């Protein structure tokens, strides 16, 4: 066994800011933070619904707060950004072939957004 110390290159905590690819990756992964807030709000709302009309009205008042509305808009934007990056990655990771030919990437991405729009419309009509 050697007594030599292995070379360990020092890295700053902000090393990723110097590389556009990693900066984009970190922004994409950071979109989870507003979604965590949104999920917690929904869970608290579910608990308020179980507790009764007074708790439900209190939760509705909380959700009507302009800061909460702004955070929910940020969560929606983050969710759409995350979906866009996922949808644009999908044809590269799993190319779809029909009749021996690979479908155009734009067709696959547009089909995914069409499915999102159709499901959203269906949920809005049902609820």
Curated annotation (Swiss-Prot):
Pfam families membership: Fumarate_red_C (PF02300)
CDD domains: QFR_TypeD_subunitC
Subcellular location: Cell inner membrane
Location, primary (coarse class): membrane
Assigned keywords, A-Z: Cell inner membrane, Cell membrane, Membrane, Transmembrane, Transmembrane helix
Keyword Ribonucleoprotein on entry: no
Membrane topology, from the record: Multi-pass membrane protein
GO molecular function, one term: succinate dehydrogenase activity
Segments passing through the bilayer: 30-50, 67-87, 107-127
GO cellular component: fumarate reductase complex; plasma membrane
The keyword Transcription is annotated on this UniProt entry: no
Record's subunit section: Part of an enzyme complex containing four subunits: a flavoprotein (FrdA), an iron-sulfur protein (FrdB), and two hydrophobic anchor proteins (FrdC and FrdD).
Family indicated by similarity: Belongs to the FrdC family.
NCBIfam families the record matches: PRK04987.1
Physiological role: Anchors the catalytic components of the fumarate reductase complex to the cell membrane, binds quinones.
Name of the protein described by the UniProt record: Fumarate reductase subunit C
Species name: Aliivibrio salmonicida (strain LFI1238) (Vibrio salmonicida (strain LFI1238))
């Amino acid at each position: 066994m050697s007594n030599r110390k292995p070379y360990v290159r020092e890295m700053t905590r902000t090393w990723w800011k110097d590389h556009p690819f990693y900066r984009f990756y970190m922004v994409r992964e950071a979109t989870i933070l507003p979604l965590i807030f949104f999920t917690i709000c929904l869970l608290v709302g579910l608990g308020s619904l179980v507790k009764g009309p007074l708790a439900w009205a209190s939760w509705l008042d909380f959700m009507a707060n302009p800061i909460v509305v702004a955070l929910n808009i940020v969560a929606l934007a983050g969710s759409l950004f995350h979906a866009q990056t996922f949808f644009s990655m999908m044809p590269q990771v799993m190319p779809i072939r029909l009749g021996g030919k690979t479908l155009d990437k734009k067709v696959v991405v547009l089909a995914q957004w069409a499915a999102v729009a159709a499901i959203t419309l269906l949920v809005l009509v049902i609820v």
